[in-house]
Amino acid sequence: MAVVLTWPTLKQPWTTIPGDIGDPPLQAWQVAWAGHALVTDPLNLWHSNTFFPDLYTYAYTDIVLGYAPAGLLGHGVAAAIFRYNLLYVLAHALAFVGAYALVRQLGAIRTAAAVAGVAWAFAPWRLAHSGHLNILSIGGVALCLAMLARGHGWSLRDGHRPALHRPGWIVAGWLVAAWQLTLGLAIGLPLAYFLAGTMLVVLVAVGWARWRTGTWLLGRRVVLANLLGGVVFGAVLIWLGTTFLRVVELNPEAHRDLSWTEMFSPPLLGYFVAPADSWLWGDHFAAARAQLSWPPEMALLPGVTLIVLAVAGLSYSTFRVRHRVLLALGVLVSGALGLGSNLVGQGDPGYLTLSRLLPGWDALRTPGRLMVWTSLLLAILAAGAISEFGRNRPKLGWPKSVSAVVLLLPLLLVLVEGVNRTPHPAVPTAPPAFQAAADPMLVLPSNGVAESDIMLWSTDGFPRVANGSVTFLPASQQQIRAVTTTFPDPGSIAFLRQVGIRSVVVLPDRLAGTPWDGLPARPVDGLGITREEIAGAWVYRLD
């Protein structure tokens, strides 16, 4: 199913990539570098081959470190692209599996769980993030919650059943949660705070029960399983958190103030607007998208079918009324937080309050991504309604074929809403000059446009390059760009040698309109360097 609903991702998996050629090549490099570092020098994982000579460059942006084992498969650029495409499909598949498992554990029937899984994994809003593998990789969120609920013998339908305690599932749930952290804190940090809040509620409930009845709700093995799993989860969170803090310490320009959050905060309208890549709704919402200042982060439609079913699930459901009320409150709270600064009071109280109070939250500059949680809660509400209908089918007196069609209709509708028309551009190939240059090297132009391509090209042997692409401009990269606008001249050559750069690769077909326009025509006589033209590109050797 994931292959079909993400098609044509696996049609030409070695040469094309879903979304665009901005972030996907960068994340393909991330996976490749993680696998490379895992087997060659794991202690220097954070010090990648890009942004030379800086340190901690692997943590310059949100990472997908958890996919490192995939980075062991194959080598070179084509393998990196294939790997990315495969993970892209598997990320959708795992999101379905996670939501399906969670909703089943909560007490829904299989058909309802399938609807919830498809609606969550292939929601229209996610099509706007076809170029963000870290945002698409949400399966661990639902899966860890399913495992933890199962381990604690808890469901919405049957409540807490101590006889069904399974410590092994608890440990597994915490390990999956820890793995989810390694796929990026954009999704992982809200999960961490949700788990922390849930633990606090459970502790209060356990203490209250002990005070009232004199008994413990959780046995020793359950407590030990939570301690073991929680310690691993906490250790991973601290490891990642301190690394990112180190990046900010070394690069103060990496700090994001609340103006970023204000810029990416969606209006209420955004919750009812589909992205352009939605096959069913894309054209229909074109006019509405034009009203959004940044549609990729503001077109947040979770699905018309999902909304209708969730509303029905408020009054008609297999789940208890109090649970439905809590789910509805969760939808409202997460939806309100997702508005960012567009909530009443400019997001304070609200998302901006969390940015000021919760460690790390200020780095989450895109409030609309909380739709991960809003849509999951909507999916659970929807599953409650479908489950109630499914269990009451025999009492309705309808022909079996009719009731079966009615039961399967929501599944068909969410499948149709998940159909994409995502572009799959061809990835630019590395010029022979790139492979011929000695590292450390600099590729010009270095203006942010082609930096992701260069990072991807470097997966063939991982030569050290001064290039790289992130959402902030490191001071060292800014200085290199500024100094080399006059390259080749004595000053720029001396500077590059001092930094440690041995080669400069110039791509003439990309120079137009940049500060390096006309660079190949500049003379090199008397500068103590050599240059060679290779297949239309130039290699300048400084040593």
Across the structure, where does each feature detected by a protein language model lie?
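Hydrophobic alpha-helical membrane-interfacial segments at the cytosolic entry of transmembrane helices
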Residues: 1, 176, 214-242, 258-263, ...
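Membrane-interface coil-to-helix junctions
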Residues: 2-95, 123-138, 265, 269-288, ...
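Periplasmic/ER-lumenal interhelical loops and adjacent helix-loop junctions
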Residues: 21-37, 234-314, 359, 363, ...
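Membrane-embedded helix bundles of polyisoprenyl
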Residues: 88-106, 110-157, 161-206, 226-233, ...
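Membrane-helix boundary/interfacial segments in multi-pass membrane proteins
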Residues: 128-135, 256, 267, 286-298, ...
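Membrane-interface helix-loop-helix junctions at transmembrane boundaries of multi-pass membrane enzymes
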Residues: 208-225, 310-350, 393-401
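Signature aromatic-anchored transmembrane alpha helix within multi-pass, membrane-resident enzymes
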Residues: 226-234, 380, 384-417
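Extracytoplasmic
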Residues: 409-543
